[in-house]
Amino acid sequence: MLLPLSCTMATSIVPRSKPMERGVVLQRTLQTDSHQKYFLYVPRQGGNTAKIFITVHGISRNVRQHAKEFAAYAERYGVVMIAPYGPADRFPDDQRLGRKGNRADIVLNAIVAEVARLTGASSNKLYLFGYSGGAQFVHRYMFAYPERVARIVLGAPGWYTLPDSTLEFPIGIQPILSMPQIQFDSARFLSIPVCVLVGEKDNRRDAELNKSTIIDRLQGKTRIERGWHWVEEMSYQARRQGLPTTYAFHLLPDSPHSFAISMERGGMGEKTFDFLFPES
């Protein structure tokens, strides 16, 4: 059971103008981009050479909630937490890395570089979580930057990129002209452990769900079906390459498609950190 932090540590958002502190959630502006905001948590013990945990919001843009919910876990596990903010007007295609508009992957790399410089945290390998649309971004980031990723946890993505080179990105991993620098190395991304978490009540075809015919046919009709299918396909492709990679799929008890309820009822925070940092 996770011990709660003090009220100040768990809920405070410290303005950027205040010097960086430990044990509080800091709101910062990226030094190289005055329009880019992110939230940062540096644990009381740690920072220097600490691992970096990144949590990515979905279309609700609830970055503050992500930062507040995960701060206690970052403290307990001694990791530096980053929660990037991606407003829809700047990142209209962030779930797919950014084929149009600003490139969410490039901005995240800049944030990570700044945090590593400010805190001394290790940016060699990243530990990522995303919920809903944020989970779509996270697994596509893993596909594009496998050398930067240690492990990921995906919370109820609406649909997935498949490890299929005959299908054009973002449905598959066939490169596209609008992102020529992104090439996919299946041997590398299939080596990264992944856990998919979906609420056991997350079986509605709601307005936000991709209902295209091709996604329904290839992946299933609900987030539960699609998550299970993707884990099975990734595991199969890894085995074909002789890779003993861990892929996990878990249903969260009494949880619909809601970040807050999945954290409160479904134990999503505990399951996320248990998978990302099994040695801690």
Model-derived segments and spans:
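Short, hydrophobic alpha-helix immediately C-terminal to the catalytic nucleophile
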Residues: 109, 139-143
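Serine-hydrolase catalytic machinery in alpha/beta-hydrolase-like enzymes
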Residues: 31-37, 49-127
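Bacterial N-terminal signal peptides
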Residues: 1-6
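Short beta-to-alpha linker loops that shape the active-site pocket of alpha/beta-hydrolase fold enzymes
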Residues: 85-89, 158, 255
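A domain-start/cap signature at the N-terminus of enzymes
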Residues: 7-52, 126-136, 145-153, 159, ...
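C-terminal catalytic histidine-bearing segment of alpha/beta-hydrolase fold enzymes
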Residues: 231-280
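The feature captures the conserved acid-bearing segment of alpha/beta-hydrolase catalytic domains
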Residues: 151, 159-239
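Alpha/beta-hydrolase
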Residues: 54-56, 155, 252
